[in-house]
Each structure stands twice: as structure tokens, then as C-alpha cells.
């Protein structure tokens, strides 16, 4: 089984890249986000690989990190999610944002993925809520905020600050992560305006 490829970028197609490794061209399917991050043809690249072996074909899927590959595997444990949908999700949400979206039960963020409807998005956040934290780099502050929001225990300035960032166009996972960091920096008595200001600084990093 192939676990990693290191070689020169030969060419690109809509959903895959050809990597030249010692004169052999490997066709590797990647998410749109990964394809955009890879270098120009002729330059070197390294991808973590998931190998699928079927009776009639061998298919390679490539990822920029082992964490992204683990997400690819985990997503496919959800009913109705195959390799194509898993790649589409990872093309829409990077691993950290996907982890935060699941921690926040933010099915709307997942549903922004082309081809993923509300029902599949809900299954993803529901079925993975207990599995994802085992390896995902989920902000502990987001997890705490998730529980507090669900139980209506979040301080009002925190809830208002998250709402304000969402109204500015940020997704709920990004807004919650930024305000979680702002809350840690400012302390429990921080007011809404201060949290928004610090949250925007976090998002600008």
C-alpha cells in the first residue's frame, strides 16, 4: 500500500494531480483546497496517500497532512458519505474548522459543501461528535462554549460577540474559536465590545 508520495508535479486536472516519482506518473485525487495549495508543474511536492484497491481499479487520494487523511477516513464512517463527498467536505472546510463545526454542532457550516444536503450534514455532526476530538485539533474553548451555548450557560457578552462576528460574515466555527481565544485573553468579566475587538484580531492573524 502507498502511504506517501514525494515527487515533481507533472500536471493538473479538475480533481486530481499527476505526480512524477522517478519517471512514473501517479494520478492522485485531492480536494479542491489541496489542489490549490500545491505548487506549479515541475516543482516538488509531498502528499500523504490513502490507497483504495477495487477489483477493477486502484485509486490514490492525496492530502497535505496525516490529520487531513484521518478526517477523510472518519468522514466515510458516516452513512451516505463516500470518498467523493469526504473530499468535497475537506475542500470546503480545513480540518481545524471542520473539527470546530462538529464541536459546535454547526451543520450549516458543513452543508455549505457542494453536494451535501442538510440531512447528510446533520449526520456528519451527529455521528462524529464523539469521534472527532480523539485526533482533531479542536479548540478546547470552542468545546466548552458549545456545551455552554447548548445549555444556555454562555455569558451574554460571549454569546453577543459570537453573534456579532457571524453578522459580519464569519462562519460560526471561526467566530466561536476567535471569541474563545478572546475570552481566555480578556477574562470572565470582559464586555461584548472588548471581545469583538480581540476576536477580530484573532481572525486577522
From Swiss-Prot:
Residues 65-143 are annotated as: Domain II. One of its GO terms (molecular function) is ATP binding. It comes from the Bacteria. It is found in: Cytoplasm. One of its GO terms (biological process) is DNA recombination. The RuvA-RuvB-RuvC complex processes Holliday junction (HJ) DNA during genetic recombination and DNA repair, while the RuvA-RuvB complex plays an important role in the rescue of blocked DNA replication forks via replication fork reversal (RFR). RuvA specifically binds to HJ cruciform DNA, conferring on it an open structure. The RuvB hexamer acts as an ATP-dependent pump, pulling dsDNA into and through the RuvAB complex. HJ branch migration allows RuvC to scan DNA until it finds its consensus sequence, where it cleaves and resolves the cruciform DNA. Belongs to the RuvA family. This is Holliday junction branch migration complex subunit RuvA.
Amino acid at each position: 500500500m502507498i502511504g506517501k508520495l514525494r515527487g515533481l508535479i507533472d500536471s493538473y486536472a479538475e480533481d486530481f494531480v499527476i505526480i512524477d516519482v522517478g519517471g512514473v506518473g501517479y494520478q492522485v485525487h485531492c480536494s479542491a483546497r489541496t489542489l490549490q495549495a500545491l505548487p506549479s508543474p515541475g516543482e516538488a511536492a509531498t502528499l500523504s496517500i490513502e490507497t483504495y484497491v477495487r477489483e477493477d481499479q486502484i485509486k490514490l487520494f492525496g492530502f497535505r497532512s496525516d490529520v487531513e487523511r484521518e478526517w477523510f477516513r472518519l468522514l466515510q464512517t458516516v452513512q451516505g458519505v463516500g470518498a467523493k463527498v469526504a473530499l468535497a467536505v475537506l475542500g470546503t472546510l480545513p480540518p481545524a474548522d471542520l473539527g470546530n463545526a462538529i464541536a459546535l454542532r454547526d451543520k450549516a457550516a458543513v452543508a455549505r459543501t457542494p453536494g451535501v444536503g442538510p440531512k447528510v450534514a446533520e449526520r456528519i455532526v451527529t455521528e462524529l461528535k464523539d469521534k472527532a476530538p480523539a485526533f482533531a485539533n479542536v479548540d478546547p474553548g470552542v468545546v466548552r462554549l458549545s456545551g455552554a451555548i447548548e445549555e444556555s450557560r454562555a455569558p451574554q457578552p460571549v454569546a453577543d460577540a459570537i453573534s456579532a462576528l457571524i453578522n459580519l460574515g464569519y462562519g460560526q466555527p471561526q467566530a466561536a474559536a476567535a471569541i474563545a481565544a478572546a475570552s481566555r485573553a480578556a477574562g470572565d468579566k470582559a464586555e461584548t465590545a472588548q471581545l469583538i475587538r480581540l476576536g477580530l484580531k484573532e481572525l486577522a492573524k
